[in-house]
Structures are given as structure tokens and as C-alpha cells.
UniProtKB/Swiss-Prot annotation:
UniProt organism field: Anaplasma phagocytophilum (strain HZ)
List of residues binding GTP: 17-24, 81-85, 135-138
PANTHER family tied to this protein: RIBOSOME-RELEASING FACTOR 2, MITOCHONDRIAL, TRANSLATION ELONGATION FACTOR G-RELATED
GO molecular function annotations of the record: GTP binding; GTPase activity; translation elongation factor activity
PROSITE patterns, A to Z: G_TR_1 (PS00301), G_TR_2 (PS51722)
NCBIfam families: EF-G, PRK12740.1-5, small_GTP
Name recorded for this polypeptide: Elongation factor G
SUPFAM superfamilies: EF-G C-terminal domain-like, P-loop containing nucleoside triphosphate hydrolases, Ribosomal protein S5 domain 2-like, Translation proteins
Residues annotated as domain tr-type G: 8-283
Residues annotated as transmembrane: none
Amino acid sequence: MSSKGDLSKCRNIGIMAHIDAGKTTTTERILFYTGKQNRIGEVHEGAASMDWMEQEKERGITITSAATTCFWNGCRINIIDTPGHVDFTVEVERSLRVLDGAVAVFDGVAGVEPQSETVWRQADRYDVPRICFVNKMDRVGADFYTCVDMIVDRLGAVPLVLQLPIGVDKGFVGVVDLVEMRSIIWEEDSLGAKFHYGDIPEGMLEEANKYRSKLVETAVEVDDEAMSMYLDGQDISVSLLKKCIRAGVIGSNFVPVLCGSAFKNKGVQPLLDAVVDYLPSPNDIPTIEGVSAKDPDQVMQITTSEDGKFVALAFKVMVDRFVGSLTFVRVYSGKLTGKSVVLNSSKGHTESVGRILLMHANNREDISEVKAGDIAALAGLKKTTTGDTLCDQNFPVILEKMDFPESVMELAIEPVSTADQEKMGMALSRLVAEDPSLKVFVNNESGQTILKGMGELHLEIIVDRMRREFGVEASVGAPQVAYRETITKAAEVEYIHKKQTGGAGQFAKVNILFEPLPPGSGFEFENKITCGAIPKEYIPGIQNGLELIKETGIIAGFPLIDFKATLFDGAFHEVDSSPLAFELAAKGAFREMASKAAPVLLEPIMRVEIITPDEYMGDVIGDINSRRGKVSEMQDRHNAKLITAFIPLSSMFGYVKDLRSMSQGRAQYSMFFARYERVPENVVVNDVKR
């Protein structure tokens, strides 16, 4: 996105929240009030411009992050609207990685919901400054003050209340601005475009003064001059107060909290003011660190400047039917023009940039260049994938990559005809390039193609996109749980691979210690060979053999995780040894280890949060117990109960129908991956073997 003006007038922000909190509705109002579009697109009508995919329009949810640009008070705002459903949390992860700030939207009735916690932790991981917007204040049961308390209790954040709601439920008409100490009332017949300032309602003066005092007391703590003035009893001016709030937001000392109703067109303009006043510009972000592509131990500092060497991070790949592959990038330094050649330092090859595009959802506008602080889409890149660094060929640097969560569900898919076979291969390769959380592999025993994803909805969307966008007709199996395996005992194995077929043979001997690791550790390989028992050129073959065979597991063909393999001895033959021989020896040692290391099956455990009316609580808890679940917490929530439980994923298929049935459609739930746990010995796992 081409810069216009200096970087201090630029904001790169994301809109994030739990599903149905009103993220896309808020974004649509932002685009309307900033003049980006001349009509308001409603999500429930399938007309939201940011939800452009057919699946998004049909379901009324955001599936893929969409980028756009608008202007407010002379400031350029690059916005990424992210999904709220847990199955698409990868879209949030890669967006937050490249953003300077975020607006967290909360449902004024439900408060801080499970996915709100997930995206908040993601923002914590990348140190993204935030503003909170408590939405849906016009809804019956909306409670601004409870939401503020939940921001403390569930997110561990320090809320800085900047507004108070005027009126409740359908009587919500505006807000008290605690910074300027005035009221803001919106005119109903102007679609929220017109509003007026006034005095604070007399009945709210005492409360407003109390919250204003808290606001000033908290804000001045980040500025020595302001703190000194405050302690001396001097008034803090509005400009100084805003300066303190901005410094505190950028330093992650607190999070401003505003409120409104995006659907009823109230509260959006002050939210835009807060984005401009308090969220950081690219200039406010500390120097970005990377490592040298030539020497990974050498740390390199990248300063945000148009005059520096070009450095950008590819955070999203999208296939456009008219343009082909589009690579979304955040530029951290330098500038780039069309028809340029850049270095993909992550993969070690150059890429030719064809066109540079400014995006508004799925609409494109050609621009001549992109500069530091901008977000843009590049056409023409062939091999660049999510997380790759693009840079000047004379400045080979690699930025920190992104980590994506483990896939927990899989299904088998087969083309219905030979003609569909080739189309399916092409479709899956493109979808995998777009989506880092989608994994595709072929089962060696059955020959079936297996898709692995984040949940039922994720896989359902993938299959639907194959059919609609690529014309692939395929038979789809029922979703299956993605089990894992691990070992519970240490085992020392000596294995000799020896084969003589005339001429040069094969010989490799390895001594490997296999040990269990704590949950979440993954796989570790350590080479402790000394005195040249195995030449160093054969070590990669051993590690590669273990990397490959661990994916086939021991018990039922599921990947083995959370273990360490230590190579401590071995032998080689001057003529018959080779990297392949040692790879085969490592695989043989792994198979021999199976009978000694007490392998067990692991299953994904989900954190399930259920909100149910009090009268159905007994039935819901009884059902949780029948699913091998464990209730960990219960909280009161507006004449309802919030139940948090940990339940095996294998027991959750069809739960949405069962919950509706037992609660007459009044209960709802959210589900998130928590961890892997050992499958109890008394539990029979049906059809678990691949």
C-alpha cells in the first residue's frame, strides 16, 4: 500500500474477537464513515464487503483475513479484518505477526469469550498494543462494567476506561467521553453519520468524575512530568492526558476501553479517533530483529525507514483467479517498485515481482511502489510461502518466522474419477500454499489422500472450496481424530543394517538412546558421537531417517511425539557405508525400540466452554461426564452458567445437536484444542488404526 505522507500518519491495525462479537460489522461501519464505501454492507444479508468468499456470505462468518485501507483525520489506516472462529485462528496468528496495533471487539452481553482469550494471547506473544471496543451495547443484557471486570479477570489486562455508556439496552443513545468530559449522542436518522457533543447527563456526573479520576491517575504513571503535575495538584490538560494514554498503550501498560453499537451505528467515530490518537505508527515500533542469512548466529537490526535496504515479511498467500498467486507482505524497511527482483532469504533464491497491488478485500488496485510501514500484495512470486523473508539481494536477512498450532482433525478424500485426480492435486497444492494449518499426505497402506486441519468447519470449507473454485468432485470420509503416539520408557538400541548383493554392499551400525520428553516437547535429536565412530557426513542421514519414520508411529500409524533420540555410538565401513545405509539403520533402530519403550496412544483434549441456562446445568454436566470429560470451573453469567470442561475430541462429534436437544436450543458452546493426553487403557478406540 503506497505511503502518502510520513510514517507517523500511518496505522497498521487488525480487528480481532470471538465469533459473532461484531468484528466485520465494526469494520463495515469504519469503511462507511471514512468514505471508503458509500453503503453499509450487512453481514446477516451476506453483503459485507470484507466477507467476499461465497462460504463467508452463506455462513455469515469471516473465514479468511481481508485487508483494506481507509483515511481518518489525515491518517492512513491499513486494516486487516480477521476471523473469530477457532478453526481459522491461523489467519489471526499471521495477521498479528505483521500488525502494529489491534482493536479487540467484545460482545457487550457475552463479555470476554473463549476465542477472545485465544486471540488476546496471540497478541501478547507479538507484543501488539490494543484498544478494546465493547460492542452491542444496545442488546438486552449488555453490561459494560462486567465486560471491564472480565478484561481484568480473564485476560489479566489493565483496562483504562475512556467512555461510559449513556442508556442501557434499546435506550443506549451515546457515550460519556471521559477524556474531554462531554457526552456524544448519535442521530438515529443519519445512519450514525451525525452526532453532537453536549454536557454529561446530571445523573451520571458522579460516576463520570470517579472514572475520570481513575483514568488520570493510571495514565500519568507513564510520564514523569505528568505524574509530578498530578501530585502537585495541577490540572492535566487534554493534550497531555492523550500523550500519556498513547505512551501507555504503546508500552503495553494498559488497554483503553471504549463502547458502542456498530450495528446501530453508534460509537465508531470515537473508536477511529482512538486508533489515530493512541495506537502506534510504524515509527513507534522498536527496531525489528533478524538474523543473517549467511550466519544465523549474527543478529541484525532493521530500522523502519524508507531509506534503508528493502526487508519485508510474507504473511499470507492467496490464489486469485484473475491474477494468480498473490503474496501479502508487510514492508519493514526500504521500498520496492514493480518489475523488481528480490531475495527470498528463507529459501535462498530470488523472486521476480510482477505487479504491486493495493487490496480492498478481493478487489485490486495497481500501485507503483510500496514503502516501509506498508502492507501490499505482490503478484508474480513463484516459491514464496507464509513466513518467508523477502529482502534486498545485498542485505540477506531472515526475520522471525511464525508458529502455527497443531492440526487435530483429519479426513480421507478420493477423487470420483481419473479426470478429477489431476485437478485435486493442483487444488490441494494451491490450498496448502494459502493455508499453513492445512496438511495433506497419502496413507501408504490405503493409498488414500488425507487432509489434516483445525476442525470440522475448517475441513468442510476446504472441501467446498475444492468443489467450487477448482471443479473437483470427490468422495469425502467422515472426520477422524488426529491421534498421536509417544513412549513412556527409555530404551537403548543397537542396530546393524547390513546388505550384500554383489559389488558394493550396505553397512551401517547405530547406537541410539530413545527417551520420553515432557508433553509439548516434540522431537529432539542429539549427536554425541566422538572419536569419529560415524563420519559427520552420515549424521544427517540418521536424523532424516528418524524424522521420516516417526511419522508412521508404532501402535496405530500415528506420528510419534515428545521423545528424544540420542546417537551415542556406531560404526561404518569404508566402502559399504553411505547416507542411505545410515538412514535405513536409524529406521531399523526405531522399529526395534517399539517393543522396549512402552509406547502409548495419545488423544487431543479440548477445552470446552458451555453457556447454559441454570435449569439445564444438571443435564449438561451429566452429558460431559458421559463423554469422559472433566469439569474444571463453573461461573455465574446473567441467569446462566458458564461451564469450563476438558473433553476428548473423539467424544465431541455431533455435540452441537446433542446440546441443542438437551437445552431446547438455549445453550451454546465453544471448543479449543488444549493438549494431548494418554488414552485410558479401559477405553476402546474404534477404527483408530489408519
